[in-house]
Amino acid sequence: MPLFPALKGRGNKQSLAKAETNEMRKADAPSVGRYEILDEYNIIPQTVSVEISWNPNTMEAMYVVNEPVMSSEELDLLKRITKNMEQIVKNTKNFPDDLSTVTIDKVIDAYLKGRKYKLNRRTTDKIRYYVKRNYEGFGPLEPVVRDPLVEDVSCNGVGVPVFVEHKIHGSLKTNIVFDSEKELDSYVVRLAQMCGKEVSMNEPIIDGTFPQGHRIQLTYGNEIATKGSAFTFRLFRETPFTPIELIKYGTATSELVAYLWLMVENLKSAIIAGVPGVGKTSTINAVLMFLPSNTKVFSIEETREINILHQNWVATSTRESIYSSASRDEKNPPIGMFELVKMAMRQRPTYIVLGEIRGRESYSLFQAISTGHTAYSTIHADSMETLVNRLESNPLNIPRVLISGLNVVIFNKFVRVGSRNLRKLMEVDEIVGTDTDSGEILYNKVFSYDFSQNRQKFSGYSKILNEIRDTKQMTQEEFDSEFQRRIELLEHLVTNNITDYTNITRIINIYYKDPETALKMASGK
């Protein structure tokens, strides 16, 4: 729970974030009579909810945050509490000298008790919500940050609606707007401070990471961004996207997910490719849920995004130098992806996971694959041809002989279905070698998206599945039965809405030892 000292100096800088105009915000939200509600769910039960509404006039969907509406009396009380937070602590004898144990709830209780307020529970809950939202949370964006289905949040300037990237509904405009330069500048300064950094006109561009793991890039003032201060942050989720959610949301079929399961279990290396924002990180987190518990994993990232429930896992991230290039202390050098990949190879992990392929460390990763390591990573590419060109070009410079050691490439793409852009695993390709005459990379399309059926279809041939069958010395009938059993387990998990990653990981690891018991658990028997 956040501690009271962390609140120092924030109260006056962060406005009530339009709590006083909540009625106006609510009025801006679509009404059921004029708009179609596509989706609705709670963020905080009985306090904050979200609606995804379709506007037939503008032909666009909107992300609507519904927060508690404050009466004038409640608003007045809220202002008094937020204005006097630190004074409340100083005037309360029951608080210990060590303020590290003092929480916001205790401060609010002390204020209400000292003034003999008798509030109903609903009013008290509202007060607690707004004080916490503005002091230890993300202010007006707190509901959005809490939403497990939101991946990215961006504000493009004053008077412009905040946009979110939703896992199911794609890019959506919200009903959250910063109305003045002063309000937005103050909010951006606070975001920078939450990352432990300072932003100013002298240093108007900041990249940072919040304590929760969320990654932000922001600009201050209007010298860089003409509409005023702006920011974009990528949300890190403590609860990772699961393979069951890939199936549940129509991103992949159970047949395709069963293929990925066998791929991971049998040490086949893969890259997840696609344009920015298409869900590559969600896919790699889902795929890594199939890692057997008796294996060692080493992950390498610039910013933490990989999240797996695995005990034998070394999770590393790069370190920036705290000095400028002109005054860098050689005793505190930056530690980059290249150094971490070399370190990973020395530790002999079963799996190496590289957050993204984009620099000289990629050559070392492909060398690791060629020497027998299993590796997973992501890359910006939308086709096999684009992928090969990127890998061969500067700054990667990976020769085709190393590229051919990769086993599988999974392409994430956006597909237009009705009015929505949905994420799909569009294509799964297996690299089978290089052409002896032309030197071209040869690959086989194992799964491809069928637009008429809105699903991925198996081509009927997989080199990898055949290799796994032969390695395990199974007949085709035995292998088909095993493949079907995994599909059955996955579909049971979907049917029974078992999407919690801890339960899924547990059932998968039980399957490796006792398939029938795992099937019973998945089916609820």
Locations of regions flagged by a protein language model:
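P-loop NTP-binding catalytic core
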Residues: 155-269, 311
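Switch/coupling sub-region of P-loop NTPases
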Residues: 259-262, 266-276, 288-415
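Terminal-proximal interaction/regulatory segments of ATP-powered molecular machines
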Residues: 485-525
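Conserved P-loop NTPase
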Residues: 408-494
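Conserved lysine of the Walker
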Residues: 280
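N-terminal accessory targeting/assembly segments
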Residues: 1-195, 199
